[in-house]
Amino acid sequence: MLCLKPGCWLEGEVINVIMEFLTDCERIATRNKAQTWYLNTRMNSEAMGNPLDVKDFIRRHRYQSFFMGPLVHCCKIYVPINPGKHWIVMLVGVDDEVVEIWDSYLYGAKSTGEDLVYDVLTVLDAVLKDEIASTKPSGWSFSKFSIRTPQNVPQQPNLYDCGVFAINIMESRDILELTLGKFHSEDERARLVLKMVMSKFNRKQNTLFASARRHHEMRSGNRICNRA
C-alpha cells in the first residue's frame, strides 16, 4: 500500500485488490451471472509472455472461476494493461464486438497499448474456446473485434497517476471528476487506502485498527502532557 503515498506510481497488486472488490460486488448483484468482468493484471502479464499457453495458469490460480462467469451473460470486460510503466484500461464490448482503449496519457490518435490489446484478445480466445464454440456463432472470435481509442478520456496531470485514473475508469465513476481542476490525487489515493482497509477481504483489519488506536492514544497522551 506504500505505492498509494502521494506522488508514487501504483503497483499492479493495488489494482488487483480493487478488481477483486468489483468482481465480488458484481457477482453478488447478479447472483453469479456476471454481466461485467473485471480481470486483474495477471491477464496482462500472461499475454506479454505466451498468449497461447495460458490454460494451465488459469486452472492453477482458479482465475476463470473467480474473475469470470458464464460467457453467455457477459456484456463487457475490463482489463488493466501495462505496455511499459503506464496503466491503460482495455474495455471489451462483447455484444458490440468492439474494444476501447482508455488511455489517460495519450499522445496522438493511437495508444501505446494497442499491440498488447491483440495479445489479450488472443488469450481470451484461448481461455474461452469451449464456451465460444457453444454460445457464439461460427467464426466468432475476440481477436476479430475492432479496436478504438476514445479521444475524450480525461488526461492525468502528471506522470504517476495512471493507475489511479485506471481504477476510477473501471469503477465507472463520473469521468468528469477526473478532469483538470476536479481531480485531486491525494484525495483519490486516500479514498483507495480507506476502501482497502475497510474491505472484508482485509485479513489484517483488526491488527491495523489496534495499531491505529494505539497511535491515536499515544498522540492524545502527548498532547495532554504538552498542555500540562
Question: What positions do the PLM features span?
Answer:
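Cysteine protease catalytic domains with a Cys-His-Asp triad
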Residues: M1-K129, Y160, A166, T207-A228
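C-terminal folded domains that constitute the principal catalytic or ligand-binding module
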Residues: K129-G221
